[in-house]
């Protein structure tokens, strides 16, 4: 609807330029917002105040001329001037009802991408292999997954890329330890303890560390024995990751793995091409690119090191190789990097070097979707009581157990296997939603008690809200798609719910553009609250007439489908009863 209003305003502006009221060459960003007070309209624009000065008119006078120049629209019943010159637009409720009827008949609930479909690479999760995933991997994994789901739902071709850390010193360390301590495959599957023991040896013994580095050199040279061990470690580690992804209900598979090692053969070419472009400078034996835009506190340009003095390559080299693979081989239109906000400088430098070097042959928009930190109650990065790293699988297991106990207390008569299933859906959903509902760039404090609360903006509340809607149809023995009739909007609570339902597509496009799932979370929470008010004030099963009951059932059906689809786009399963 906002796009429709923007188009109407643009047509009015064009007319006023033709009439000589406005000067030529204006290209304002037309802002349309939801009106705060519904008695004064559904949407508001400040366009008259923005253009009053170039028009040489008072805002209210320009607003009057804009209203007169607005084309007629079946979607708008009237437009009024408010305050210093706001344009307030009132929706035509009949047109709104028709749009909702159409949405109910549409698999995508009326949601369409604002622009043309694109090919989008999502760089997400990216754990370092050789040890198990920890809580620090949660945000990249689930935020990336949610945005990928939304983009796919809107019609984009999404390529997920799990840029795992599958190369480097840690593998030499593990191979050296395995040479000293031959163990069985079963023992090796406990990778965390094996890694911890190897790291202890590496830190304590210089001889061991030297041997480990030597094995890395052999690995890089393609030594068959080292490659076989590396493959074994990698497969075990990826198997651990896959179990975590499945528990998280994240759409990542082995086929999505595109680790650091995938770019090994191109690293020397990256350095050679940078040199050919005249971008490389040798600094203390290292090969660097210096960009004037990025300076240290002393005002000196910061180096982007692509090759160390000993010939080794760095993260920047691998990321540059990945950029040109994604642009020139995958032909992506966008590449979204869901990586910690603290890596912002690194990616800004890499993107700029890639542009200057001509690595982005196919036009590709590169966006670092940085995120904040998940902290403990003390406001510091989340740790175990003894200060260690929390395994992600352990956190999720605890969430399942806590939710199971909570659900069992509320529903002691349910069979244990059903309680276990509900506990898993609620527990995993609670952890994910608590994260996704926060602004991507914000830090937040992890709190089991808050996230498992059945009140407030939480997964349990939304899951229960969905079961309420499903319960109405269960009583009737109908599905959401088995209600005839037409939607007719009469009561204020019906209109409020309808107006919010109509915004689903706009919300999804916002998430797709900015990579911000919290916007979808806020929308679903608001929608659940509006349905609750509608349900309490507009009887469905006890409606006054059959046509009124059908209309309200259709509103309820669209609410149920929107809640279910919205939660699915966040990566949350739903339940038919709790």
Swiss-Prot record:
One GO molecular function term of this record is: ATP binding
Has UniProt tagged this entry with the keyword Ligase?
A: yes
In which residues does the motif 'HIGH' region occur? 127-137
One short Pfam name that applies is tRNA-synt_1d
Report the Gene3D superfamilies cross-referenced here.
Answer: Arginyl tRNA synthetase N-terminal domain, HUPs, Isoleucyl-tRNA Synthetase, Domain 1
Q: Give any Gene Ontology cellular component.
A: cytoplasm
Q: What class of enzyme is it?
A: ligase
The protein's location, in the record's own words, is:
Cytoplasm
Q: Which UniProt keywords apply?
A: Aminoacyl-tRNA synthetase, ATP-binding, Cytoplasm, Ligase, Nucleotide-binding, Protein biosynthesis
What GO biological process, any one, is recorded here?
Answer: arginyl-tRNA aminoacylation
Its Enzyme Commission number(s) read 6.1.1.19
Keyword ATP-binding among record annotations: yes
User: Which reaction(s) are listed as its catalytic activity?
Assistant: tRNA(Arg) + L-arginine + ATP = L-arginyl-tRNA(Arg) + AMP + diphosphate
What is the similarity comment for this entry? Belongs to the class-I aminoacyl-tRNA synthetase family.
Q: How does it assemble?
A: Monomer.
- NCBIfam families under this entry? argS (TIGR00456)
Protein name per Swiss-Prot or TrEMBL:
Arginine--tRNA ligase
